[in-house]
């Protein structure tokens, strides 16, 4: 990395590397070494190299280090302490390593930490949350903050271009949405012709479909908005993705 930076001499570096597991975070439970290396150790190495050069940079983190809502029932803000981590002993291995990655970057100089949450967009892809909802036999109907992928990328780049203060930012589309609401939008836009089935509760989901706990949380993106970077309200963003879906019919 030092050699590349010396050769290319960039103005800004983005760390989009990480380990998420395929097809989902359950896979991280069986490859813990690489998960730890990619999500917790690598960010620390990049920090050291960037600070040695005085280089500004951004790290793509995750909102999956939180679960539920804040103590007062409101969405989590950047100053809240993550509650879905190894320290709280209730998380997936993936979430635990992403939380460690943020701990490694505590006090980092000239650094943005961007929290992504359940990425989606209008392109059919196995990593797209909308595609996953279409493919699963049964869904868990919970409320979440999510991020339109292209808007997320634009927001990250705007952080550097607009020279907003360094620090941590929740980069999610304002508001929250449930899986059931998303499937209803899909039907309204004529992109799906199936009847969706839902688990009765999280207990049934964990018993029948998951190997490790999932993060479901509401996050505030007000700090980002106050810095002058706007994203569409989440229902509007999902509607846009469904309206502009690139595959005529998936199901």
What are these regions (language model features)?
Residues 1-40:
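NAD(P)H-binding glycine-rich loop region in Rossmannoid oxidoreductase-like domains
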Residues 13-17, 57-63, 69, 114-116:
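SDR active-site strand-loop-helix element
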Residues 30-37, 41-42, 64-114, 121:
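Catalytic helix-loop patch of NAD(P)-dependent Rossmann-fold dehydrogenases
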Residues 38, 144-147, 177, 219, ...:
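Residue-level signal for the nucleotide or nucleotide-sugar donor/cofactor binding architecture
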Residues 52-55:
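A short helix->loop->beta-strand "cap" motif at the edges of active sites that frequently abuts
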Residues 103-153, 158:
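NAD(P)-dependent short-chain dehydrogenase/reductase
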Residues 155-158, 162-209, 215, 246-251:
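Mid/C-terminal beta-alpha module of Rossmann-like enzyme folds, strongest
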Residues 232-251:
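Amphipathic terminal alpha-helices
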């Amino acid at each position: 990395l030092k050699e590349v930076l010396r050769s290319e001499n960039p103005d800004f570096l983005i760390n989009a590397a990480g380990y998420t597991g395929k097809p989902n975070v359950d896979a991280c439970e069986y490859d813990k070494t690489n998960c730890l290396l990619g999500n917790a150790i690598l960010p620390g190495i990049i920090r050291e190299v960037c600070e040695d050069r005085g280089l500004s940079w951004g790290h793509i983190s995750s909102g999956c280090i939180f679960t539920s809502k804040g103590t007062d029932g409101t969405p989590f803000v950047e100053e809240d302490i993550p509650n879905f981590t190894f320290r709280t002993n209730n998380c997936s291995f993936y979430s635990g390593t992403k939380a460690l990655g943020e701990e490694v970057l505590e006090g980092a100089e000239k650094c943005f930490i961007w929290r992504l949450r359940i990425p989606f967009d209008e392109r059919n892809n196995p990593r797209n949350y909308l595609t996953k909802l279409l493919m699963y036999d049964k869904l868990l109907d919970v409320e979440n903050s999510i991020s339109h992928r292209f808007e997320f990328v634009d927001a990250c780049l705007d952080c550097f271009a607009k020279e907003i203060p360094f620090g941590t930012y929740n980069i999610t589309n304002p508001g929250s949405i449930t899986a059931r609401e998303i499937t209803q939008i899909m039907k309204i836009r004529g992109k799906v012709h199936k009847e969706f089935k839902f688990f009765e509760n999280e207990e049934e989901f964990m018993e029948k479909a998951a190997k490790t706990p999932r993060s479901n949380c509401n996050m505030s993106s007000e700090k980002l908005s106050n810095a002058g970077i706007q994203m569409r309200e989440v229902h509007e963003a999902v509607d846009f993705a469904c309206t502009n879906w690139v595959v005529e019919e998936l199901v």
